[in-house]
Amino acid sequence: MDVADLPGVPEWLPDHLRDDGIEELYPPQAEAVEAGVTEGENLVASIPTASGKTLIAELAMLSSVARGGKALYIVPLRALASEKQADFEEFEQYGLDIGVSTGNYESEGGWLADKDIVVATSEKVDSLVRNDAPWIEDLTCVVTDEVHLVDDGERGPTLEVTLAKLRRLNPDLQTVALSATIGNAEALATWLDAGLVDSDWRPIDLQKGVHYGQALHLEDGSQQRLSVQNNEKQTAAIVRDTLEDDGSTLVFVNSRRNAEAAAGRLANTVRPHLSTEERDQLADIAEEIRDVSDTETSDDLADAVADGAAFHHAGLSRGHRELVEDAFRDRLVKVVCATPTLAAGVNTPSRRVVVRDWRRYDGSAGGMAPLSVLEVHQMMGRAGRPGLDPYGEAVLIASSHDEVDELFERYVWADPEPVRSKLAAEPALRTHILATVASGFARSRKGLLEFLEQTLYASQTDDSGQLERVVDDVLTYLQRNDFLEIEAGELDATSLGHTVSRLYLDPMSAAEIVDGLRDWERGASDSTSASGSPADAQAEPPANSGFTTASELAEDADESDADRDPDDISALGLYHLVSRTPDMYQLYLRSGDREEYEMELFEREEELLGPTPSEFEEGRFEDWLSALKTARLLEDWATEVDEATITDRYGVGPGDIRGKVETAQWLLGAAESLASEVDLDAARAISEARIRVEHGVREELVDLAGVRGVGRKRARRLFQAGITDRAQLRDADKAVVLAALRGRRKTAENVLENAGHRDPSMEGVEPAPDVSVDLNDGADGDASAESTANDDQASLGDF
């Protein structure tokens, strides 16, 4: 189909597409147009990577906006939101306004009301619906990317419920769902009342195969000689062979440690193939990487990149990941060793893809388990860059003849698995049932079940009784913890329930926080956790359990004569409290950690909020220690321990630190609101702990670190130079500020301007010679420097 023949699109679009080199649509795109995607029809497009899904989305959204509507593009990851924002901003030259929102789950996003196209994560859209964002009802088109992720146990239920709510709010809403090739695309189309484009067409050929011995065995039965030289690993041989043909390679491995180790080894393979110009450019990129953060991870990445290799995983900071992705797309970095996060939609294709590890550790299986066909096919789909490569090759690694046959049967010739809803799990339903009632989507048990009948889960199961049983268990839990009132089948969210829904908390997290704060304030030694499972909540609590609902607590708060001073709550106690909630991904206990944190617990147990589980409660006690380890990381961050020490001490990457800090910041903010809701006097202590962990500083630096552009390291330098708060910075001697900031004029000007200095210009100013600061970290890689206006809250699960 010629772009001139597109129906229903803005008149400027055909010329715009031609300017981008697009004269005719790909076959799947033409099928989508024939199915009515530019005329408001619902559509599911299940097609391979790089087959034109983004243009299908753009056709749907732009035609909807041309009819006077408003479009929403839902992405699974924050990184994808930034990428799509950059893509769609091309349309601003034609008068369209693009907005992106991925954080601040308490906001209704009023500023998005005037945007023509909004890009957001599914969690953000869910929170907008909960907070009654009025512009949601103005939507005429919603596109959801990677819709096959409804199969994901953690994020899938949110996407599923959010789509169901949007379709109920806007009965005429056009829904376009983009998916990888899956085994049951027709089931998604049926659920969404949509037409279906189900195609395996690709713009360039993809050859799949298995490497073993001295040959690459391809799916058509042919063999290609690919020799392994003396002492050379198979992966290195494949990378070398690709380099000799001027190609790039993506290597997928099963852990962060393996990604880093493989990149270090493959750098030796790449180095001899680099030109002098490439070496110089890579050296500059390596220095940029070192500037992002002063950590061992940053140094290891910079060393690899200098030699044309890189690793990529969720433990890297956003700055690291963007530098790696850009260098790979620019063909400077020749090989990237990645965990499967890179296969989740970020646009980084390569000539060859090597799936080195097809098993990974699975705690539920008690050991190593094979990857799904869908995951492996997603990785393989990254092979081949349209317009750059004549073909793409995807290679699995076999260690024996038998394994060659197994890999062909398991992955090369196999069809992807069907996607299945994960909504019926109790943790997912806890959150979404409360939100559904609090936002008015259901006001009775019957209405709740009717709403859930609109989900994918309901369309995939014949056992409605199972859903009813789980729903009733969850309703009992929510009632027992004072989140819902239930009378004669009618459901009403309590004030606390509304607050929890607005804060985007798992109700179990809220129960844990309220109970922990209550335990501290009342000084009770016999209280029990309010975070038992819904099944446990069916039984009446024992008479001596100390269980008190939040409403009862509010009535009793003034009557207790055994209260502790709420200002005595330690930061560690609060960090531990939020670290043991379901909304925080705890650090694992490594070998040898248990003894260390048992000793830590013995020494600091009095600071913790709530009763410590018995050592005989193996699972709960282990979780308690894991939460303590996580809390200690947060405490280190808030007491200005440098990032390099934290990454080494806890075995994490810079991105992990940022993730834990942002999640703790959000949960502590929620704890402040909960404390006020149930009349607990801990808000001031919680606020201080939140601000300190937000900026990563001790108490005396809180005011300084709050100045935009300062951050933890610069705040300490300014403090040591005698500038102790924002007011002093506003009136400070510019020479002293310049010296404290190590002569960086632009940085000093920005800091002074943000502090409100009457004349922030550094023209003609020299650093004061008598100012010295006792910091030898060598980098200004404050975590805060990585944030932008759009990064006010981390999207949970991205880390």
Curated annotation (Swiss-Prot):
Pfam families: DEAD, Helicase_C, Helicase_dom4_arc, HTH_61. A motif (DEAH box) lies at residues 145-148. GO terms for molecular function: 3'-5' DNA helicase activity; ATP binding; ATP hydrolysis activity; DNA binding. One of its GO terms (biological process) is DNA repair. It catalyses: Couples ATP hydrolysis with the unwinding of duplex DNA by translocating in the 3'-5' direction; ATP + H2O = ADP + phosphate + H(+). Residues 34-200 form the Helicase ATP-binding domain. SMART domains: DEXDc, HELICc. ATP binds at Q29, I47, P48, T49, A50, S51, G52, K53, T54. Residues 553-566 have a biased composition (Acidic residues). Its EC number is 5.6.2.4. The keyword Nucleotide-binding applies. Residues 234-435 form the Helicase C-terminal domain. Keywords: ATP-binding, DNA damage, DNA repair, DNA-binding, Helicase, Hydrolase, Isomerase, Nucleotide-binding. It is an enzyme of class 5 (isomerase). Residues 522-566, 750-799 are annotated as: Disordered. The keyword Nucleus does not apply. InterPro entries: DEAD/DEAH_box_helicase_dom, Hel308-like_dom4, Hel308_SKI2-like, Helicase_ATP-bd, Helicase_C-like, Helicase_Hel308, HTH_61, P-loop_NTPase. Belongs to the helicase family. Hel308 subfamily. Monomer. This is ATP-dependent DNA helicase Hel308. The gene is hel308.
